[in-house]
Amino acid sequence: HRGAPMARYDAGSVSRRTAGWLASRGTGPNREIAADLSTVLDRSRDLARNNPWARRAINAIVNNWVGSGIRAQWASARRQKRWTGWFESTDIDADGRLDGYGLQSLIARAVVESGSALIRKRPRRMTDGYSIPLQIQVLEPDWIDRAKNELTIDGGYIVQGIQFNALGQRTHYWLYPEHPGDQTHRHSMISQPKPADEFLHVYRIDRPGQVHGIICACGCSMTCTTQCLSGSVKAPASWPSCATLSPETPPSRPVRSSRNSSLD
C-alpha cells in the first residue's frame, strides 16, 4: 500500500526547469540591500539619463502619484492664506528653487529613481522674514553613510547609517556634510549624527525591518536594458503598470516668491 503523494510547491522543486535558479538562502532585507544598493542606484540613474523607456516610466509614475500637486485645505481662511503664501512660493524650499508642489514632484522622482528620499525640516528664525519659519530640504539617500554599522554604548545599534535605540526606534541619521558624489573638498567627508526627528525618510517598505528603500523597477531593469539594446521598440511587459498611463512630465505650476507675504 502506498501513501498519498506529498504535496509540494513548484518553486521548491529541484528539476530541469529550476536548475539555473540560484536563490539566496534566508537573507534578511538589510543584508540584501547592503550587497547591491550602490550598484542598483548607479544603474537606475544611468537608465533615467539614457533610456527613453525609463524616463517615460519615471515621468508617468510621478504624474500618477502627485500630478500637478496635492493640495491642503484648511478650515480657517486665515490659516489657508498663510499656508498658501508659504507652500505656493519658494519660501518652502531650503534651496530657494521650487514651491511645495515642485518639492512633491522632486520627492516622488527621487523615490522612483533612487528608492528613497530624505526630507529634512530646517527651522528658521522669525527674523529671517519667512511667513512660516520653516524650510524643507530634499536629500538623496546617498547622503546617508551606509558603511556605518556598529553597536552603541546605550544598548542601541547602527544599521547602514541609521541609528536605533535599545527599543528599535530611530534616533539619528549619520549624514555626510555633502553629497559624496559631489565632493568639493570644502568638507571632511566624515559622517555626523543628525536627530531623526528632523527627517522624514520616504521609501516603500517591501520587507519587515527594511531600513532603506530600493527602486521599485529593480526587477525589470535588466529586461528594459536588454530590449532597448536589441532594438525593440516595445516597452517591457514587466515595467510597472502605472508607467503606461502617460509619457508626459507632470504638469508644472508657476513658481512665485512671497518672502514678505501677508499673514493676515
Where are these regions (language model features)?
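Low-complexity, highly charged intrinsically disordered N-terminal segments
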Residues: 62-91, 103-107
